[in-house]
């Protein structure tokens, strides 16, 4: 039986070569699927996108509206909200009933516990290992090695609070921010 070959430009792919190619493709696909989560874990998350920040969310997941927020909180309060990367961030109410231009990340720099505000002692006190931070989040007692991270807090024209990455000098330590 005579077989008529197609174009001489088309390479002949034998059964063995086809099976090798199919096996290689299958193994590569499975390996890539297995490695994807590991590689994604090693790449740090973005800090809220390039849009200039994220809108702070209250405990119920609603956008923080500044006038309503100030009506229900007193001067000196530090109130948890969802901030950059979804981290808990304290919104600071100043003495003149305005919101401070900074937010304080509530994640302890020792082992990552959420640090509650202790109003009676006017400081943040970590329940895990006893680290303490002053009212601005500067570490005053270890074992935490660093102060709490800061975020810019800005009120938008539509009365929402936007938190963005703090990249300037840390006003508490006069050093470059360790978190940027």
From Swiss-Prot:
Positions bound to [2Fe-2S] cluster: 108, 110, 126, 129
The protein's required cofactors: [2Fe-2S] cluster
Coiled-coil intervals, chain numbering: none
EC number annotated for this UniProt entry: 7.1.1.6
GO MF annotation list: 2 iron, 2 sulfur cluster binding; electron transporter, transferring electrons within cytochrome b6/f complex of photosystem II activity; metal ion binding; monooxygenase activity; oxidoreductase activity; oxidoreductase activity, acting on paired donors, with incorporation or reduction of molecular oxygen; plastoquinol--plastocyanin reductase activity
Disulfide cysteine pairs (residue numbers): 113-128
Biological function: Component of the cytochrome b6-f complex, which mediates electron transfer between photosystem II (PSII) and photosystem I (PSI), cyclic electron flow around PSI, and state transitions.
Designated name of the protein: Cytochrome b6-f complex iron-sulfur subunit 2
Organism the protein comes from: Synechocystis sp. (strain ATCC 27184 / PCC 6803 / Kazusa)
GN (gene name): petC2
């Amino acid at each position: 039986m005579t077989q008529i070959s197609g174009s001489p430009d088309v390479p002949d792919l034998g059964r063995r070569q086809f099976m090798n190619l199919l096996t290689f493709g299958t193994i590569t696909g499975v390996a890539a699927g297995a490695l994807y989560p590991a590689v994604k874990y090693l790449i740090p998350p973005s800090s809220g996108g390039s849009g200039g920040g994220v809108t702070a969310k209250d405990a119920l997941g609603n956008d923080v509206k500044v006038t309503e927020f100030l009506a229900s909180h007193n001067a000196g309060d530090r109130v948890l909200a969802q901030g950059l990367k979804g981290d808990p961030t304290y919104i600071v109410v100043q003495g003149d009933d305005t919101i401070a231009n900074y937010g304080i990340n509530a994640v302890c720099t020792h082992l990552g516990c959420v640090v509650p505000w202790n109003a009676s002692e006017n400081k943040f006190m970590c329940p895990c290992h006893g680290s303490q931070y002053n009212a601005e989040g500067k570490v005053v007692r270890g074992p935490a090695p660093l102060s709490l991270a800061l975020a810019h807090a800005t009120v938008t024209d539509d009365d929402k609070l936007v938190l963005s990455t703090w990249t300037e000098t840390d006003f508490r330590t006069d050093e470059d921010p360790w978190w940027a």
